[in-house]
Amino acid sequence: MKWFQTAILCVAIALTGCANTSQQSAQKWLYPPMAVPLQPSVQQEVQIARLSQLLQRPDLSDEVRAKMHYERGSYYDSVGLRDLARLDFNQSLQLNPAQPDIFNLLGVYFTQVGEFDAAYEAFDSTIELAPDNTYAERNRAIALYYGGRIDLALEDMTKHYQEMPTDPFRSLWLYIIEAEQNPEQAKANLQQRYLRDRSEEWGWVLVAIMLRDVSDEDALKAIMDGTRENYRLAERLTETYFYLGKRNQLEGDIASAISLYKLAISFNVYDYVEHRYSFLELAQIYDQLQQDRLAKLKAAKTLEIE
């Protein structure tokens, strides 16, 4: 059923992409399409309370206690309580260090807050413990990208992409990293991959948006029309607004990028990297704007002295 809905969505976007200019202008949104922000479920709250009670028992083995800390940390993470999740994950690792999934999650946390060296170490630990963990490969490449180590990021992401060229998210992140070195060539490469590998998988819609193969208005309308469940709409809009923000940022439209990253955050899809990395994107943009402002002030003072 999920595949069918995605196929319908892709067909809708393909059809709207062929609409004439007057139809497109009539479909512009006065306000950005939204979903109701996700809220913690009763099940999540009950599981956190249950695990907290069980962890108070003194007769638990280290193996069981480590597993419970991991489970409670995962629930904390799913409702946005990341500092509490991180504490639980660290406690779980103290009891059982051989947990690659926890190292991967900690690496994402470190990336989000800009602690890149710690992120690299966490992802390296994940890959050492689980060499086939493809999420850690991608996440390490992304951490290297945000940490400014573009050559290493490109090497990692190229290898990751080549392992599954039909994965649209691998294509997207390869493009984002390539664009740091050669924007025009990166876009041409993405266009080639899009024409060769695209399918009904949802992620290729995001590639089409990145390439402007479909207008933003038509894409958002198709997403709204083709998505019934609020949670699914929140997930898709989180991804859409993040990659729209990244596209606008790469094109130099920083003001729009800031607004779109804020929209990506607003749906509370805490376990999506697009939600997590929107915070990092905003922090890096604000840091750069502050540096630019200070540089202008310094230049102005230099002119006054002269």
Regions found by a protein language model. Name each.
Residues 78, 112-113, 146-147, 179-182, ...:
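Register position in tetratricopeptide repeats
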Residues 63, 97, 131, 165, ...:
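Short coil turns that delineate tetratricopeptide repeat
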Residues 71, 104-105, 139, 173, ...:
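Canonical tetratricopeptide repeat
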Residues 74, 108, 142, 175-178, ...:
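Residue-level recognition of tetratricopeptide repeat
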Residues 62, 66, 100-101, 134-135, ...:
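Helix-start (N-cap) detector for alpha-helical repeat units in TPR-like alpha-solenoids
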Residues 18-71, 291-306:
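N-terminal leader/linker segments that initiate helical-solenoid repeat arrays
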